[in-house]
């Protein structure tokens, strides 16, 4: 899979989920930028893409290295929240524990909800017993 290196405010103007879908279809799994448009940033997580925010200086350094080295490859360790260059330089990035859990386990909002299926069914059964008029038919 591929990593997309971009400039600031990436995803501006793309308020629909089609933008992350297209990037995923093209083979990207992570996007690195100094900043992202808010809606795009959140849509990335909802669609299994990892948006990584680095400083402009860090992104500039990566662009220079990519331009100077054909076949340049970055390595991302989501569990450790690190990005490593071929020379061994490591950058850390922030991600909430919830979003990291979802990405590491391949969970979208439906998958996350289904992890609690037993609890949901138990609640429904308890409600059915205590308020049967809600369940006519």
Swiss-Prot record:
Gene Ontology CC terms: 3-isopropylmalate dehydratase complex
CDD domains per the UniProt record, alphabetical: IPMI_Swivel (cd01577)
Glycoprotein among keywords: no
EC top class named in words: lyase
SUPFAM superfamilies associated with the record: LeuD/IlvD-like
Family (UniProt): Belongs to the LeuD family. LeuD type 1 subfamily.
Subunit text: Heterodimer of LeuC and LeuD.
Name of this chain's protein: 3-isopropylmalate dehydratase small subunit
């Amino acid at each position: 899979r591929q990593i997309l290196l971009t400039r600031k405010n990436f995803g501006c103007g793309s308020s629909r989920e089609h933008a992350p879908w297209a990037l995923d279809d093209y083979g990207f799994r992570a996007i690195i930028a100094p900043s992202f448009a808010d809606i795009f940033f959140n849509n990335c997580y909802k669609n299994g893409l990892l948006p990584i925010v680095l400083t402009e200086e860090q992104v500039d350094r990566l662009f220079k290295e990519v331009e100077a080295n054909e076949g340049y490859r970055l390595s991302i360790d989501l569990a450790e929240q690190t990005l490593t260059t071929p020379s061994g330089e490591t950058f850390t990035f922030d991600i909430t524990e919830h979003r990291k859990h979802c990405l590491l386990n391949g969970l979208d909002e439906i998958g996350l909800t289904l992890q609690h299926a037993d609890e949901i069914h138990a609640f429904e059964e308890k409600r059915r017993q205590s308020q049967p008029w809600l369940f006519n038919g």
